Amino acid sequence: SAGWSLLALWAALVVKKAFLGRSMVRGLMLFPYVCPVVAAALVWRLMLHPTFGVVNEWIVSAGGTRTDFLNSRSAELSLLGFDLTVPLALSTVIIFEWWRYFPFAFLFILARLQAIPAVYDEAAQVDGATPTQRFWYITLPQLWGVLSILFVLRFSFTFNKVDDIDLLNGGAAGTQVITIKIVEWLRGRGDIGSAAALAIVLAVILLVLLAFYFKFIHRDEEAE
């Protein structure tokens, strides 16, 4: 959720300013979200295919070895003299989720940015505030409400996500989420009781999160 929101915040700050072709850039940023999930997942699977995928062709041309990004649980990575084990399939799915759903957060954040009165920023400039100070003390406090909403929504989306992961790799290599497990128990094993029990646990977790939001975050917003 944090990476998704930071990416959307950066994009919203960039396109908020007027520049040539801004409308076209805004439209292109919405493409991942409006693109059908079946088409998006298929394109990613083709690009990441270990045999004929374009990403692996680039890796081979750079002197690397072919990698099955969607079905390899982990991979060894050497960075600054340290050997790291990276959850490869999980990281790939997370990057796909960032790419696909950051336009959703982008729209929320951009709308809030455009609603902030320009007089605040102008007054800060007159007082000699730097761009960084204006962001931390004027812009960011105005965004806490929408960022908290996005966190709750994204957390809920992650728990309920089935189609993206199922189409990418079927939940293989450590990418299985609770909803995939529920579907597997229900359809694959016919274990209706276990599937229903897990679904109830999931619903309770989401209700607790929602109650926390309304009790603390939403109450603070109304007080302001």
What spans do the regions from the language model cover?
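A structural signal for multi-pass alpha-helical bundles of membrane permease subunits
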Residues: 1-224
